[in-house]
């Protein structure tokens, strides 16, 4: 939910960029000053924003770990030294990925923006992602958000979280396998969404999400084909505890080449 003003002098630079968005009910502006430093305005919670950005990750150790397993990924990591995995809000990440099923990026953005505008706290120009209670309180107007077949799933998820039937905060304490299984028990969550949420919200760095792009990479680069379960398991076995980072390097490289 962060956007860059590409018309600004800062964003036209190859070195740095200024991004504005919402984090924890605050409007945040971030600008990369140098390859190793970021200027953040809009919050005093330096520890929190650092954790959100994955700035505390030991990249040297992580990259060494996955590079020892595959020289190709080692090269990709060299070309993208600052890539990190976000620690997104549990509820927001899960709810957003539920909306993302069978939709392109533009459509996903429209749905998330609509939900935030209709139900989220107005922060002055931007809106926070709504809480489960805010969604339930306005559930009678959910049709205005134009979520399509995702509408009832979205409201049901909010109800389960708000009632305590689904304790999403406990998912970080589970093993990857337990988390993956529990997530797939949610209506509308398949294996790809479960892996994405496990990785980006619940810090299971051994998750290895498979979408069409990664599926193509795994086939062309490693000769791995078959079911989602088979390809994902291969990636997790090959790259180990930081398979999620390896997946991001592979995805980024293919995206750039595409």
Where are these regions (language model features)?
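A residue-level signal for beta-strand positions that form part of recognition/binding surfaces
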Residues: 9, 18, 37
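Alpha-helical ds-nucleic-acid-binding substructure associated with the helix-hairpin-helix region
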Residues: 46, 50-185, 238
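Single conserved hydrophobic/aromatic residue that forms the stacking wall/gate
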Residues: 2-11
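C-terminal accessory module of base-excision DNA glycosylases/AP lyases that mediates lesion recognition
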Residues: 1, 15-27, 125-258
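Short helix-coil boundary/hinge micro-motifs
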Residues: 22-29, 34-48
